[in-house]
């Protein structure tokens, strides 16, 4: 019995789900592949900022702009970022399971080495404390959303990149992307 090609492809890209409609069709689970991740690993340095994007997810729809999330590379293959579970340290390989990733170096620092070291130390301390996620995006509390964490660890370097969204000033991932405080080192948008 010969199985049609379309059926093999369809069943290979369809995932079972525990709620209706019971199936999810994802022909490309993640577009950033092994070769892309190798280039990221060869490029990234401690203190670099990474942005990522997932296609087809609700949070991507609700986050204005192309990029949806930010983290800081702290060395030892670890990214620190703020997620709904709090501020965490995660393996860079897990962070890069996405549909697009961009790596930036921070530029125009007056004392680059000590400022980057301080940013890394602040990020690691936030992860060690597992600082809560800032669900109200107020900036007036001791919790962080992803890009706010990046701004705080770099001593409010991105203050000029906030935009008014949802009735308050918010640093969007695209704000970091367009900032004069960073330089793109690598962009993977397969």
Regions of interest found by a model, annotated:
Residues 1-190:
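Cysteine-nucleophile amide-bond enzymes
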């Amino acid at each position: 019995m010969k199985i049609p090609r379309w059926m093999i492809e369809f069943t290979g890209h369809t995932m079972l789900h525990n709620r209706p409609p019971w199936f999810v069709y994802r022909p490309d689970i993640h577009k950033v592949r092994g070769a892309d991740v190798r280039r990221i690993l060869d490029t990234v340095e401690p203190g670099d900022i990474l942005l990522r994007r997932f296609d087809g997810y609700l949070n991507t729809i609700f986050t204005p702009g192309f990029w949806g999330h930010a983290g800081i590379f702290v060395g030892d293959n670890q990214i620190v970022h703020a997620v709904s579970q709090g501020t965490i340290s995660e393996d860079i390989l897990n962070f890069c399971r996405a549909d697009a990733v961009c790596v930036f170096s921070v530029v125009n620092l007056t004392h680059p080495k000590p400022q980057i070291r301080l940013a890394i130390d602040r990020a690691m301390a936030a992860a060690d404390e597992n600082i809560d996620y800032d669900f109200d995006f107020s900036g007036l509390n001791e919790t962080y959303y992803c890009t706010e964490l990046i701004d705080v660890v770099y001593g409010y370097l991105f203050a000029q990149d906030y935009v008014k969204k949802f009735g308050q000033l918010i640093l969007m991932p695209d704000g970091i992307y367009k900032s004069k405080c960073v330089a793109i080192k690598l962009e993977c948008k397969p």
